[in-house]
Amino acid sequence: FEQECPCYNAGIYKKFPDKGINIMERIIDECHKRGIKAYCHHRISEVELTSDRNELKQNHKDWVIKTWWQEGLWNLASKELQEFKLNYVTKIMTKYSFDGICIDFLRHLPCLPVGKQWEYRECVTEFMTKLKSNMSNLNRQVAVGAKLPENIEACHKDGFDVEKWAKNNIVDFVVGGSRTVNPDIDWYIILSL
């Protein structure tokens, strides 16, 4: 599992498996002992912070959007990438007893073809719908959420049809306004009604 789904990609976490400690399990267990829910936070398009090239991006250039980041960012318009991401997240959520999953769409954008994000919005909706379905098939209740831009205009610009997600109960929660200190709180309240 660790080869397929590396959970210890940051240097600080690499020391724990060598000492026989499963840090993810430990953190989740300690949260639950204290009555705190534990959520997995998954960046949809992580950037590589080492000098090593991302082999997956090198081997699947059709999964990548050429952008400001040297190796590009993940392209959710690719069905194959969607399946890879769904399998990746589902494996994590199956292995660990997280209470929920939050897909971070703000680290890093874009995740759809530049200038055509709204045109490709169904790709992200399809991804989130499948994720919700996968989570509902686990043997426990798992909340599904998304970290989103500061307002409706920014969501639409990035290709997130959050009104549809809310209407169809695709997400259980949103983390809003991550690119500003002045998010449109009223819009997020209306969205939740």
Regions found by a protein language model. Name each.
Residues G11-Y13, L73-N75, Q117, A146-L148:
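A short, structure-level motif marking secondary-structure boundaries and short turns
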Residues C5, N9, Q70, A143-V144:
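A generic structural signal for ordered alpha-helices
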Residues K14-D29, K33, A38-K95:
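Active-site-adjacent "subsite" loops/lids of carbohydrate-active enzymes
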